[in-house]
Amino acid sequence: MKRLSRLRRHRAAGPLLLVFGLLTIGTTFQVASAVTNTTTLNADRSAQIEEGKQLFIKGCSSCHGLNAEGGVVAPSLIGVGAASVDFQVGTGRMPMSDMSQQAMRKNVVYTPEEVHALAVYVASLAPGPEIPGDELLNYERDGSIAEGGELFRTNCAMCHNFAGQGGALTQGKWAPSVMGVEAKHIYEALVTGPQSMPVFSDKTLTPEEKLSVIKWIKHAETEPQLGGIALGRVGPVTEGLLVWTLGIGMLIGVAVWLAMKAR
C-alpha cells in the first residue's frame, strides 16, 4: 500500500494517467465511429436494395419474374451482377421497347440513382460482375493504344468491323458501333457479354488488356474521317469503288448502246 501511495505521488503519475485516459477515449471513439459508419452503410445499402426491388417489381418483373428468376420471354437475372444491370439499363437497352431480336440503345428511362438502385438489388440476389470504379477505369494511365488496336482487331473486328462501326450478324441481329460509348459501359460489356456478345473473362482479356481496348476505341473516336463521305471510317476507298463501279457500268452501257445503234 505504501509503495502504491508513493507511485501515485510520483511526478510522472499525472502525465501518464492523462496519456492513458486520452488513449482510452480515442480508442473508444474510433471503435464507436467505425460501428456507426458500418451501421450507416448497411442502412443505406438496405434502403437502396428496397428501392431497387420496388423499381424492379414495377418495371422489370413482368418479363423477368417477381424474383428475377426469368421466364419464357426473358432470362434469369440471378448472378448477372450489378455490371450487367448498369450496362443494360444505363444505356437504355432495358426496358425493351418491343420484343425484337435485339435490345436497341435508346434514351435512358431511369435516373442514375435509380439505375444504381436496380443494380444493387440484382447484385444482392447472387454474386456477379461489379460495376467498375474510376480507379479501375484509368485507361489513360494503364492502357496501350498499340496493344488495344491489336486486341480489338483480333477479338472484336469480326463483328464490330475493324473501325468499330458495327456490322450485321445472323438472324436479324447486329453488332452496334462502339464509338461514343462510355468507358464504363465498354468495360461492362466485355465482362458481361450482352446480347450476342461473348464474355471476355480476365483469363481471356486481363483488366489491363481491356483498358487497352478502351484506350484504342477512345483514340479512334478522335481520328479524322478521311474522304468526302464518312462511310464507316473506311475513307476514300469506298467512294472510289462506288465511282469506279458506276463509271465502268455507264461506259459499258454506252458501248453496248453504240454497238446496237451501229447495227
Predicted regions and their residues:
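Ser/Thr/Pro/Gly-rich low-complexity linker/stalk segments immediately outside membranes or between
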Residues: S33-A47
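N-terminal soluble segments of membrane proteins
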Residues: K2, R141, T245-G249
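C-terminal capping alpha-helices of c-type cytochrome domains
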Residues: R11-A34, N107-G133, S201-R263
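Ferredoxin-like iron-sulfur electron-transfer modules
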Residues: Y139-A146
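N-terminal secretory signal peptides that target proteins for export/translocation
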Residues: M1-L7
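Sequence context surrounding c-type heme c attachment/ligation sites in exported
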Residues: A32, E50-I57, A82, G149, ...
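Extracytoplasmic electron-transfer domains, predominantly the class I c-type cytochrome c fold
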Residues: I78-A126, G172-Q225
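Periplasmic/extracellular electron-transfer cofactor-ligation site
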Residues: R45-I49, K53-G79, F87, T91-S97, ...
